[in-house]
Every structure is written in C-alpha cells, then in structure tokens.
Design a protein with these regions (language model features):
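Post-His helix in hydrolase/transferase enzymes
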Residues: 123-138
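Alpha/beta-hydrolase-fold serine-hydrolase catalytic core, especially in secreted/extracellular enzymes
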Residues: 140-142
Length: 142
C-alpha cells in the first residue's frame, strides 16, 4: 500500500494526510479509524455504502444484498486525527446531508467547507484553496 511505501521511505503516519474523494472517503475513514495521521480530508463523503445503495436503488433490499465494510458514520468517532470535510450542498450524487452528518459526528479538531453552489465535483476556487491551506498549516507534523 501507499502508506507502507511511504513508511519505507521514513515518513511516519503522523506526517501523512489522508485524502479521500467520494467512494474513496470510505477507505480514508476506514484507514484513519485504525491509526493516527497528521490529518484527514474528505471530499463529498458518504455515511455508508448501504445508505448510498438505498438512495440509488430504493426499491431493492440493499441491507440484505450488500454487506457494508465502509460504515463511515459508525467509524468517524474512532478517527483521532484533525479532519476537514468538504461537501457541495448541490451534490446530486452523494447527498449533502451525509457529509454534514459525518462532520457533526467527527471529533474535534474539525473544519468544514460546505459551499451552496458546488455539486459532487468541488470547484477548486480561491475559497476552497484558502480552506485547504489553512487546514494544512494548522497540522503540527507537516
């Protein structure tokens, strides 16, 4: 994995920032729930794969068909790293309420960036870049 490769190069986990986008946020939360990192950034995160399945296929028995390993809402409290959650309120793929719910459940220190107009793919405008820079500069081991 990338983490093991970086550790082989002498980089410690507390010097790494995990970044997950959309489906990748489930993996980032899973990994961050097991070890402390310098920080975690989640872009357009979902609460669980089952929640997403129920949203996309409301007519199917998703909880029976899908065994969910990526229960981000259940695991977010185990994340002990500083966290930045970014989610566009106009997201038409992963509902905004999922990112907001994860933010509400996350431990401090935490930062949010919830622009009204952004959809699933965030616009990397001046405000978002400023938020990222401020978050990264607040991390102690970078």
């Amino acid at each position: 994995s990338t983490i093991k490769w970086l550790e082989g190069k002498g980089v410690k986990k507390n010097q790494m920032v995990l970044y997950g986008e959309s489906l990748g946020t489930g993996i980032a939360v899973e990994v961050a729930s097991k070890s402390k990192f310098a920080g975690v950034i989640l872009e357009s995160p979902f609460t669980s794969m089952q929640d997403m399945g129920k949203k996309l296929y409301p007519y199917l028995p998703i909880s029976i068909l899908q065994h969910d390993k990526y229960l981000s809402l259940n695991k977010i409290k185990k994340v002990k790293s500083p966290i930045l959650i970014m989610h566009g309120q106009a997201d038409n793929i992963v509902p905004f309420y999922m990112g907001k719910k994860l933010f509400d459940e996350a431990n401090d220190p935490k930062v949010s960036y919830f622009p009204e107009e952004d959809n699933h793919m965030m616009e990397y405008n001046e405000e978002l870049i400023k938020t990222l820079k401020n978050f990264l500069s607040s991390l102690s081991n970078l």
